[in-house]
């Protein structure tokens, strides 16, 4: 069983921060941290593509080709596309390929505090559009090869997801599994959670 680092229950559902790899879990939605070319060649995105099989890479390549026909970028920062889970269909119904801010790029790094919330807002809108979702499984967006500063990013990620689960409108899902493996990110998330626990929406249910 995956290690549970944190659980917090809000008005409409629960955020659980768990260890392991995303494909070890299951839910209606798997989110992969894509790049703007949808190439499936970097970091966690490459690992998810490998688990889902060549058909996923073929699907995202076809999306890119269709976008280029109309002179549009394959998938601009903050936006997302949806594919089948292909070889992961025993665990998931849809895969959302979401492009968060790439902090290796100075222009995106400067705007990262605005771009990351917009990325999640577009993910949440897509989940509503898909419907019939109970569980969302995702690694923390932009915290891997895109080099978002972990301490800032950990707090912002918690703020965004918990705020959505505690908003007046139903979020469109009941459980968000944030799957973490990077030890530095885990350490920073634990620190910001401990320091700001009374400011986050909801109630801690880690030991429940």
Predicted regions and their residues:
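Macrodomain-like recognition of ADP-ribose-binding/processing modules
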Residues: 1-208
């Amino acid at each position: 069983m995956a290690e549970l680092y944190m659980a917090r229950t809000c008005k409409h559902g629960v955020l659980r921060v768990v260890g392991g790899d995303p494909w070890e879990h299951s839910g209606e939605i798997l989110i992969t941290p894509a790049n703007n070319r949808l190439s499936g060649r970097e970091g966690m995105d490459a690992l998810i593509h490998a688990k889902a099989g060549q058909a996923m890479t073929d699907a995202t390549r076809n999306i890119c080709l269709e976008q280029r026909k109309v002179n549009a970028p394959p998938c601009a920062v903050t936006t997302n596309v949806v594919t089948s889970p292909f070889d992961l269909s025993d665990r998931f119904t849809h895969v959302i390929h979401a492009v968060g801010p790439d902090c290796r790029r100075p222009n995106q790094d400067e705007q990262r505090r605005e771009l990351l919330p917009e990325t999640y807002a577009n993910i949440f809108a897509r989940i509503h559009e898909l419907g019939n979702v109970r569980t969302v499984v995702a690694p923390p967006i932009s915290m891997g090869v895109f080099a978002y500063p972990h301490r800032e990013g950990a707090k912002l990620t918690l703020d965004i997801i918990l705020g959505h689960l505690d908003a007046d409108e139903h979020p469109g899902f009941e459980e968000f599994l944030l799957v973490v493996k990077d030890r530095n990110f885990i350490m920073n998330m634990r620190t910001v959670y401990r320091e700001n626990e009374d400011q986050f929406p909801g109630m801690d249910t880690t030991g429940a």
